[in-house]
Amino acid sequence: KPGMSELPSDELDVIKLKQGRPVFGVDLRIVDDEGQVQPWNGESTGEVRVRGNWICSGYYGVEENSSHDEEGYFGTGDVACMDPDGYMRITDRTKDVIKSGGEWISSIELENVAVGHPAVKEAAVIGVPHPRWTERPLLIVIREPGVELGKEEILGYLEGKVAKWWIPEDAVFVEEIPHTATGKISKKDLRVQFAKYPLAGAPPATGGQS
């Protein structure tokens, strides 16, 4: 974009870490759970939907076209936010995002912060059922060999680095985290493994998140 070369290096680095701007000929919008189009303000998140002459018309072998909305936008399954200059930052996948009290929490962003702790070898975050908020984040951690790391320390490490209501409800330590054939963390297997995980002090279902 014109003028980028004049930006301070730290601001330029932030832009370079984003996924870029929509290419010519593609309409792009960010949509929430209710189908409401989200503003390009660098904060609002939702599913990325695209429309254009060379966007796929559907999935091969699937007769019912459920991949597009009534306006012809294709749901990519990516969760992202757009800044005012049109640069996109992908934060998660719709199947992995944690929907808590009507808000979306990025599992990937939580994982990226957690692995910044020197005692964390690998981390995964999934949503587990909660009677009040529908889902709450659960942090699953593999410690580095020979180091001590407790629940309070790793959860405290996240404070100030993410929104307060993003802080996982609990943290568990494991010896192994399942992966797919391509080397990605298998959130599907983790959701099955921890489907009935008891969140300590989960209150009865009442009201909305505050």
Where are these regions (language model features)?
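AMP-binding/adenylate-forming catalytic core of the ANL superfamily
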Residues: 52, 57-58, 79-166, 176, ...
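General small-molecule cofactor/ligand-binding pocket signal
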Residues: 171-174
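Conserved AMP-binding/adenylate-forming
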Residues: 1-87, 94-97, 111
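Phosphopantetheine-dependent thiolation modules in NRPS/PKS and related acyl-activating systems
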Residues: 184-210
